[in-house]
């Protein structure tokens, strides 16, 4: 967990995750949260909120990504990088985390190897590797 802020009015803790990137897309909530590679970031924030709640903390219903986006349009590096910063709100949803943990635990303790997921990039890599006999 990167950080926890305190909401002075609601008296709740706020889950914060710091991220850095060098993306040419405009840094908006919609662009950031709709990126397929950021799905795991949302899960990560939800898990942090779940853990805090189960430790007895009252968790604010929104978490935030503090994103630093490097400017890729500079002529050169010259010993410095410029960043655009944005705070991206995310509506937390962690009611399913416990069932996911139980499912993972069951899978880890099973002697059966699950079928691969056709949409999983890691599974595709493993299938390709296996087809090459590596």
PLM features: what roles do these ranges have?
Residues 10-12, 42, 60, 117:
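A structure-centric signal for secondary-structure junctions around beta-strands
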Residues 34-42, 110-113:
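Short, charged/polar micro-motifs that form catalytic or ligand-binding hotspots
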Residues 1-32, 48:
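Conserved catalytic cores of phosphodiester-cleaving nucleases, focusing on short active-site segments
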Residues 41-53:
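An active-site-proximal "capping" alpha-helix that borders the catalytic cofactor pocket
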Residues 51-134:
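Metal-dependent nuclease catalytic regions and adjoining charged, substrate-binding loops involved
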Residues 1-2, 42-45, 94:
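Generic internal hydrophobic packing segments that stabilize the cores of diverse globular domains
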Residues 24-39, 83-91:
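Short histidine-centered catalytic/ligand-binding loop motif
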């Amino acid at each position: 967990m990167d950080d926890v802020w305190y909401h002075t009015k609601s008296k709740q803790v706020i889950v914060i995750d710091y991220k850095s990137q060098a993306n040419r897309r405009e840094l908006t909530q919609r662009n950031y949260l709709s990126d397929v590679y950021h799905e795991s970031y949302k899960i990560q924030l939800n898990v942090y909120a779940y853990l805090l709640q189960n430790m007895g903390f009252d968790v604010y219903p929104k978490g935030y990504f503090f994103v630093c986006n490097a400017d890729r349009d500079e002529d050169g590096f010259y010993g410095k990088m410029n960043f655009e910063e944005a705070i991206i709100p995310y509506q937390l949803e962690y009611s399913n985390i416990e069932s996911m943990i139980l499912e993972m635990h069951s899978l880890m303790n099973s002697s059966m190897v699950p079928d691969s997921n056709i949409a999983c990039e890691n599974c595709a890599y493993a299938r390709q590797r296996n087809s090459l006999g590596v």
